[in-house]
Amino acid sequence: MVSKLSHLQVELLGALLESGLTKETLIKGLSEAEPYVLQSESQHAINALQTEKGESCPEIPNLPNGMGETRLSEDETSDDGEEFTPPIMKELENLSPEEAAHQKAVVERLLQEDPWRVAKMVKSYLQQHNIPQREVVDTTGLNQSHLSQHLNKGTPMKTQKRAALYTWYVRKQREVAQQFTHAGQGILTEEPMGDDLPTKKGRRNRFKWGPASQQILFQAYERQKNPSKEEREALVEECNRAECIQRGVSPSQAQGLGSNLVTEVRVYNWFANRRKEEAFRHKLAMDNFSGPQPTSAPPLTPHNSSSLQPPPALSPTKVHGVRYNQQPASEAESSSSNHHGNSSMVTTQTILHQVSPPGLEPSQNLLSTDTKLISAPGGTLPPVSTLTALHSLEQNPHALGQQTQNLIMASLPGVMAIGAGETSSLAPRFTNTGGSTLVIGLTSTQPQSVPVINSMGSSLTTLQPVQFSQQLHPSYQQPLMQQVQSHINQSPFMATMAQIQNPHALYGPKSEVAQYTHTGLLPQTMVITDTANLSALTNLTPTKQAFTSDSETHTDSGIHTPVSQAPAIHLQNQDTAIQHLQSGPRLTPSPAVSSSSLVLYQSSDSTNSHSQLLPSTHNVIETFISTQMASSTQ
């Protein structure tokens, strides 16, 4: 090192001073450039600068580690504005000269390496020995957040702070090595180097389970949630052995783990805490499972679920029975056959359960088997449950606690037909051979867009509107036996496609579907079929249907049904199998009756009579007709 500045160096210093820098700034910058240069070199440079300017400067005192005292910038000062002096630097004074020289040499070597690589090495050492960062912060005086960012993300850190961190790292390595070396002698404390340090805080490290011990304990918990004392002691030995192997020492030196030594009490507490956590999670799961969820419902489909809304065109002005309101309940008695067994009914209700609106109470479910018929201006109307679960209706003489509300229903008078796709009139266009087809006639004569629910399997998969603009022009002067020569050009089809998972769960196959007359009762229809039949909904070809009225009729199949004094409606299909609908006591189903049968529905003006839901044979469809329709056919 030259003792005299060259002409170029003098010019450079003069240019720096002329640029506005002060003498103190230059001295501090020169000191920060190389904080760990030898004192003689740093002092010679500063003395040369002062000699050039003709000023004198007091010498910087030497530290025990041979480093020059530096003046820190603002970000290196403490929170109260004082200069930052790492406590660990003062602790070096208590070391022997040989130990201090050794640590200084190792620290200087680490400072010359990549800071990010050294940071990862320090972090790995902390994890290996389960050392918390709090211990580093207490010893070095570094900021907790700054230290964490430097170790995890490589955030830059001042050289002097890194020197303090590396000094702690070197000293900790020596302490841990001494602990495991003299573990069997019992002469060492947890912090052998910290008791005599003036800045050491009297705070021991908290016990922390290592990853190796946790893996062993969780495996043991799967086998036995409440181990015995002998089993816990065996786990203690196994955990301590794993911790020693993790640290790279012999299992016989387990006492060197210090505060991380696993004991039987700690194992007992760990199992007790796990049992409490499991019981708490089980309680939460039971509360969530059994708790009421009035506003939640399973989504119909991952797509198009928001389209499940009543058709906007189905207003009370056009269809007087679309939405049910609070009306006086009329008790109804119904009989239906259930020859398919309970398992079929469960399958059907499971498939159709998602159709129920989420806001309905349990007594307002669309599939409720004890739902009563609701009185409406157009006559006594069957609820939706009678359309979806006909053979599950049971007699309930008690009045309803809560009447069904907000049920989307076909306006009556009208006709509902239920038959399989394998029919004489539907087979040419419908491709569904195993499912069921449900047609509900309505009174609206205006074209409108209605929703179509496509059900595949046990969940609703699509929901889309279908527009049917063609209309059927009623002619009440035409005879009832007149056949429609063109397609049934109904206005909107309220189509709900529900392919039953079990083809025989609700409605069995029928040879044909009853044929409807051109009476203006079927301008609006709801059809339940599968996806392949959607394109054929507007091309249905009607056949004939006869309505007669007498006091007593015998069917060709030998079924005899007595009729009361009240007028009755008869529906005849091409097989001349006639079912009678009357007002009277409940009828017993015939042995030949199945769940997919024809039913006529009629309401009477008598307050003592009850509407009947009658079973029939396979060849007849189920039809609901109100009193107005009955009077019009007489």
Curated annotation (Swiss-Prot):
Quaternary structure and interacting proteins, as annotated: Binds DNA as a dimer.
Residues covered by region (Disordered): 50-85, 287-319
Lineage: Eukaryota, Metazoa, Chordata, Craniata, Vertebrata
Tissues where this protein is expressed: Expressed in liver and in oviduct.
One GO CC term on file: protein-containing complex
Stretches assigned to the POU-specific atypical domain: 90-185
HNF-p1 domain residues: 1-32
Pfam families: HNF-1_N, HNF-1A_C, HNF-1B_C
GO biological process: glucose homeostasis; insulin secretion; liver development; pancreas development; positive regulation of DNA-templated transcription; regulation of transcription by RNA polymerase II
Subcellular location: Nucleus
Entry similarity comment: Belongs to the HNF1 homeobox family.
Key words of the record: Activator, DNA-binding, Homeobox, Nucleus, Repressor, Transcription, Transcription regulation
Reported function: Transcriptional activator that regulates the tissue specific expression of multiple genes, especially in pancreatic islet cells and in liver. May participate in the control of the hormone-dependent expression of the lysozyme gene in the oviduct and liver. In liver it could repress the gene while in oviduct it may act as an activator.
UniProt GO MF annotations: DNA-binding transcription factor activity; DNA-binding transcription factor activity, RNA polymerase II-specific; RNA polymerase II cis-regulatory region sequence-specific DNA binding; transcription cis-regulatory region binding
Name of the protein this chain belongs to: Hepatocyte nuclear factor 1-alpha
DNA-binding positions: 202-282
Region called Dimerization, residue ranges: 1-31
Main location: nucleus
Top-level taxon of origin: Eukaryota
